[in-house]
Design a protein with these regions (language model features):
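Metal-dependent phosphoester/phosphodiester hydrolase catalytic core
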Residues: 2-33, 38-532
């Protein structure tokens, strides 16, 4: 839990001792420990690494979770509160510590620690670490956002999603680290909730499908133990939102894909949200039961504002479902035709409160670039339906094509609020895609924005239809056989989005190459395809 103590608390002398640390990160460093009972803690406390996130001009969230037995429900920790010292320094050797304090790792939050390290200078990099039980954590590198309203030369942001553990290794993250991004934006499917499944697997999930807190903790630990994923957290601050698999496939509010008992599903959602909170460097309030607000903005000086949304927690039921399906607790229909309620203007993807919040943010944002960090593909897309060979269009019920009125509200808001240079970044579809966004009231007019879906870190999508249908769906680019991520580089005049594709996501040492690039021009909405 957050408890950044500005002044360093006095150290009880009877428990003080000085230790010499091993390990490259802290070689030769001396530090003292004031933790009562620290000697009783098991070793290997920092098995899950460290992370930073949600930078502000004067602060950044620092995260770790003490878990000497990371796959155990309690992480192998005693059921007691544990003091954890944190330090922020200007140098990697911690000779110039500028902020420090003691936070408490509480058993009811899985001994996770979220420190709001404040009093920092804007727009610069810092090093941080945690100390507990005579051990030092790995050293992470964080970054503060530029000063509010400051002119900023540039922003480099890598955006990614969908990292199914079983489908590949995390070579993509090694390449992200090499890009030295200011910020990493993760757009959902950080974990997958499925049971271990050997089909197409290069490695297996280590616990059965989670439904309770212990199960979700073990699943996050499985992912977080990966050294390449840890290295990406250690290299730069992240901003995250979730999609469905952080809880369960294709859920909508309180409805699971199987339309099971909503009360049972909300108990599961509460466990999943708590585990998500416990494992991510989020600047949000901890969850209360099955509720956790994660939509928020993040400013990068005068240059950019990210509006990070949650399209799962508050969405209405999927459209065009057969009557009585929910009541009968039968699985939802994921491919739908057109029906009366598809375009019902009252149907919502974000929920009314989040929609109002977004409307206000889009109207008041002072930023030159406005980046909507959302989960999936916004462009209206036709999908094949093997069950219906007729020419009638079919849509995915689970992405924005299943909530067209909600999507058009955002597009119209960009126009009416004169939002400066809007862009949408997304994930979810396990494919790279890029498209112009047009005003729904002037479909033949010039683009009002562009959207970029940045592939998947590992998760697969093998169907040939995605590329076949791409021209008809108006995609300027479509690639679903290559894994990877997107990189956004912007400055005051313009910038680019580059898609980075792995040679083979099933290899830890895979190389990477640019597979597409699009240029952006401030004041001229839309994307411009470049040749690689
Ligand atoms: Fe996914
Ligand atoms: Ca998804």
């Amino acid at each position: 839990m957050t408890s950044p103590d500005a002044p360093q608390p006095p150290r009880p002398p009877e428990f003080s001792r000085r230790l010499v640390l091993g390990g490259a990160a802290a070689a030769g460093a001396l530090f003292s420990i004031g933790a009562q009972g620290a000697s009783r803690l098991p070793s290997g406390l920092f098995s899950l690494g460290v992370a930073s996130g949600d930078p502000e001009p004067d602060s950044v969230i620092l995260w770790t979770r003490l878990a000497p037995e990371p796959l155990a429900g309690d992480g192998g920790m005693p059921a007691t509160s544990v003091p954890v010292r944190w330090e922020v320094a200007e140098d990697e050797r911690f000779a110039r510590v500028v902020r420090s304090g003691t936070a408490r790792a509480e058993p009811w939050w899985g001994h996770s620690v979220h420190v709001d390290a404040d009093g920092l200078k804007p727009g610069r990099a810092y090093f941080y670490r945690f100390l507990a039980g005579g051990e030092a954590s790995p050293v992470g590198r964080a970054r503060t956002a530029p000063a509010r309203g400051a002119k900023v030369d540039r922003l480099r942001l890598c955006f990614a999603s969908c990292q199914k553990f079983e489908a590949g290794f995390y070579a993509a993250w090694r390449h992200v680290v090499a890009e030295d991004p200011d910020l990493i934006l993760f757009l959902g499917d950080y974990i997958y909730e499925g049971a271990p499944n050997k089909k197409d697997a290069v490695r297996l999930h280590r616990n059965p499908e989670p439904i309770d807190l212990a199960g979700y903790r073990a699943r996050y630990a499985t992912y977080k133990l990966d050294p390449l994923l840890q290295a990406a957290h250690h290299a730069a601050p992240w901003a995250l939102t979730w999609d469905d698999h952080e809880v369960a496939n294709d859920y909508a509010g309180a409805l699971s894909e199987g339309n099971g008992d909503p009360m049972a599903f909300l108990r599961r959602r509460a466990a999943a949200y708590q585990a998500y909170y416990e494992h991510q460097p989020l600047r949000v309030r901890p969850p209360r039961g099955a509720d956790m607000r994660i939509y928020r903005t993040l400013d990068w000086g005068a240059l950019a504002q990210l509006q990070i949304v949650d399209d799962r927690q508050y969405r209405g039921p999927h459209a065009c479902q057969p009557a009585g399906l929910i009541e009968a607790h039968k699985p939802y229909r994921s491919v739908i035709g057109d029906c009366a309620d598809l375009r019902d203007p009252s149907r919502s993807m974000l929920g009314a409160a989040q929609e109002r919040w977004l409307d206000e943010r889009l109207a008041r944002s002072p930023a030159q670039w406005n980046i909507l960090g959302q989960q999936t593909i916004m462009r209206q897309s036709i999908v094949p339906d093997a069950a219906d060979p007729s020419d009638a269009p079919h849509y995915s019920a689970d992405n924005w094509s299943g909530y067209p009125a909600a999507r058009e509200k955002i597009f119209r808001r960009w126009v009416e609020a004169k939002t400066s240079n809007p862009l949408a970044l997304g994930g979810d579809i396990h494919a790279f895609a890029a498209a112009q966004i047009v005003d729904p009231d002037r479909p033949d007019g010039a683009p009002i924005a562009a959207e970029f879906v940045g592939g998947s870190i590992t998760s697969l999508r093998n169907d040939p239809d995605f590329k076949r249908l791409a021209p008809g769906n108006g995609l300027a680019f479509a690639e679903n056989m290559v894994r990877g991520y997107g990189r956004l580089d912007i400055d005051a005049r313009g910038g680019s989005v580059t898609y980075r594709g792995l040679a083979d996501a099933r290899r830890e040492d895979s190389g990477i190459a640019d597979i597409a690039r699009f240029s952006l021009e401030a004041g001229r909405p839309g994307l411009h395809v470049e040749t690689i």
